[in-house]
From Swiss-Prot:
Has an important function as a repair enzyme for proteins that have been inactivated by oxidation. Catalyzes the reversible oxidation-reduction of methionine sulfoxide in proteins to methionine. It is an enzyme of class 1 (oxidoreductase). This is Peptide methionine sulfoxide reductase MsrA. It catalyses: L-methionyl-[protein] + [thioredoxin]-disulfide + H2O = L-methionyl-(S)-S-oxide-[protein] + [thioredoxin]-dithiol; [thioredoxin]-disulfide + L-methionine + H2O = L-methionine (S)-S-oxide + [thioredoxin]-dithiol. Keywords: Oxidoreductase. The lineage of its organism: Bacteria, Bacillati, Mycoplasmatota, Mycoplasmoidales, Metamycoplasmataceae. HAMAP family: MsrA (MF_01401). GO terms for biological process: cellular response to oxidative stress; protein modification process. PANTHER family: MITOCHONDRIAL PEPTIDE METHIONINE SULFOXIDE REDUCTASE.
Length: 156
């Protein structure tokens, strides 16, 4: 199993979408690369943490490649949008991939060069090592399982 941290706007929709993909075994939502330890949603949305709403993804690389994950995410978000997706605005909604394996970092940078040729505007996608990840509050976990009619920037 491999692990990657994915951001693409509000983490509710990103998690809901990723859970539909064959090969993804487990997801959680949380806050990545925070300047403060153990940030809360209230702190994140106040912009004092610089954390990004992120989905931790554990996947079977024998079924799904990192490139597949990038391609599928880019099909449902705007990777050229800086600090927003859909109606959600703010740095916590930026898009990116945060890696724990240096080889994944190299691969992601190569993929960004490849995918950038498909867009007129430059990609705003962050590719950074994961400095930290804190689980979001329980009410954020698997949000669309609990609230299937909630509004989302991602259609799935």
């Amino acid at each position: 199993m491999k692990k990657i941290y994915v951001a693409g706007g509000c983490f509710w929709g990103v998690q809901g979408f990723l859970k539909t993909i064959k090969g993804i075994k487990k997801t959680t939502v949380g806050y990545a690369n925070s300047l403060l330890e153990n940030p809360t949603y209230e702190l994140v949305k106040s912009h004092v943490t610089d954390a990004v709403e992120t989905v931790e993804v554990i996947y079977d690389e024998n079924i799904l490649s990192l490139k597949d994950i990038v391609k599928k995410l880019f099909a449902v978000i705007d990777p050229t949008a800086r600090n927003y997706q859909g109606p959600d605005h703010g740095r916590q909604y930026r898009n990116g991939f945060y890696f724990v394996d240096q080889e994944d970092g190299v691969m992601l940078r190569e993929l960004m060069l490849e995918f950038s040729k498909k867009y007129e505007k430059p990609l705003a996608t962050e590719i950074l090592p994961l400095d930290n990840y804190y689980l979001a509050e329980d009410y954020h976990q698997d949000y669309f399982d609990k609230h299937p009619n909630a509004v989302c920037h991602i259609k799935f």
